[in-house]
């Protein structure tokens, strides 16, 4: 008797063949780690008469010596080395750096020097002498363009603050639009200081909108210490990135805020000041670089923390006023994982 092959068997064979072909030809997606870290006053020990760096000199009340500076570099490098699950991070945004040289010194440390980072930095007019910076793995990506976006306030023209750093990077054949932020502080209270952050949000959102107008699927990452929480007006009304349908931007750290987690501990309460905001083009991309709304983490290890005899632990900071504690930073870093073809 002649045996026949039934439709069910044929279907199974076809599915198996598709599985084999797909798994042979589909490229493995590479994990690209993006990190943001407020490094708490990374100053060198050299006097710069163009900025106010008097606190961070060897003869200052803080006694900021070369030995302490080198320890700070080593400590920060340890954090940035440990934060990535596999290799060193591919993109690192920093704030509270004095100048380009301190950033170059950081990436010249033994552990970070293993990767060929290139630094993007522009000197800002900030009255404290602190800037933002970006470093990227030059063997994986390249810079197409960058600019420092200046912030000014018509209602307070004397205030000078740090720029927003924008970089256009080519990564794995895909274009990433990256913004590094350190918005004006909450000094003087939330109500008094909020207008400056609302202005910063307006400037950032306008720039992002100009990119999305040219390319609706543009892949945008805005990271930084925004000095606002995910539910503050700058985020919900101007950036318009709170959870919700049909929004072009999404704050990936909103759920941390809702859960009472954070990157900065103020008087025993955690606040999610450091955040990642991404465009829907990055969230819903089938090709190139993509991410998910669960691909963000706060990096928090016991060795980075200060454990008081009473009260809750907080990030182990370098200084408290003039008192030297020798810690890493008063902020915790955050990490975003991209998946690139």
State the predicted function of each range.
Residues 39, 97-175, 179-183:
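Structured beta-strand-rich core segments of catalytic domains in phosphoester-bond hydrolases
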Residues 26-30, 85-86, 111-113, 125-129, ...:
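Extracellular/periplasmic catalytic domains that process cell-envelope and extracellular macromolecules
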Residues 34-39, 64, 69-72, 76-103, ...:
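Active-site beta-strand/loop signature of hydrolases that rely on acidic residues for catalysis
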Residues 50-53, 174, 179-193:
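Active-site His/acidic residue clusters
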Residues 101-104, 128-131, 187-190, 229-234, ...:
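Extracytoplasmic/secreted cell-surface and envelope-processing proteins
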Residues 5-26, 210-220, 228-341:
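Metal-dependent phosphoester-hydrolase catalytic domains
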Residues 58-67, 88-94, 121-122, 153-154, ...:
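Second-shell loop/turn segments in exported
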Residues 2-110, 114, 120-130, 309-312, ...:
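N-terminal, active-site-proximal structural segment of metallo-dependent hydrolase catalytic domains
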């Amino acid at each position: 008797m002649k045996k026949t092959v039934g439709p069910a068997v044929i279907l199974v064979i076809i599915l198996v063949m598709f599985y084999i072909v797909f798994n042979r030809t589909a490229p493995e997606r590479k994990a690209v780690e993006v990190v943001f870290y407020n490094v708490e006053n990374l100053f060198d020990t050299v006097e710069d008469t163009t900025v106010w760096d008097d606190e961070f000199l060897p003869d200052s009340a803080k006694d900021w010596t070369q030995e302490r500076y080198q320890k700070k570099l080593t400590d920060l490098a340890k954090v940035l080395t440990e934060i990535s699950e596999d290799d060193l991070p591919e993109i690192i945004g920093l704030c509270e750096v004095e100048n380009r040289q301190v950033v170059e010194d950081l990436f010249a440390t033994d552990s970070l020097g293993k990767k060929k980072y290139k630094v993007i930095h522009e000197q800002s007019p900030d009255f404290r002498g602190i800037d933002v910076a970006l470093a990227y793995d030059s063997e994986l990506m390249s810079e197409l363009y960058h600019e420092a976006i200046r912030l000014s306030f018509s209602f307070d023209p004397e205030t000078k603050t740090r720029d927003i750093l924008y970089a256009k990077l080519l990564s794995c054949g895909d274009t990433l639009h990256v913004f590094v932020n350190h918005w004006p502080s909450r000094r003087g209270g939330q109500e008094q200081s909020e207008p400056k952050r609302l202005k910063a949000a307006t400037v950032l959102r306008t720039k992002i909108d100009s990119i999305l107008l040219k390319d609706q699927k543009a892949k945008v990452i805005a990271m930084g210490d925004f000095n606002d929480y995910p539910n503050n007006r700058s985020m919900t009304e101007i950036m318009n990135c709170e959870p919700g349908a049909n929004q072009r931007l999404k704050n990936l750290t909103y759920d941390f805020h809702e859960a009472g987690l954070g990157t900065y501990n103020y008087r025993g309460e955690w606040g999610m000041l450091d955040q990642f905001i991404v465009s829907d083009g990055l969230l819903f991309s089938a090709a190139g670089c993509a991410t998910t709304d669960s691909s963000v983490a706060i990096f928090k290890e016991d060795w980075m923390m200060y454990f008081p005899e009473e009260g809750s632990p907080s990030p182990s900071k370098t200084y408290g006023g003039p008192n030297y504690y020798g810690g890493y930073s008063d902020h915790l870093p955050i990490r975003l994982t991209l998946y690139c073809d």
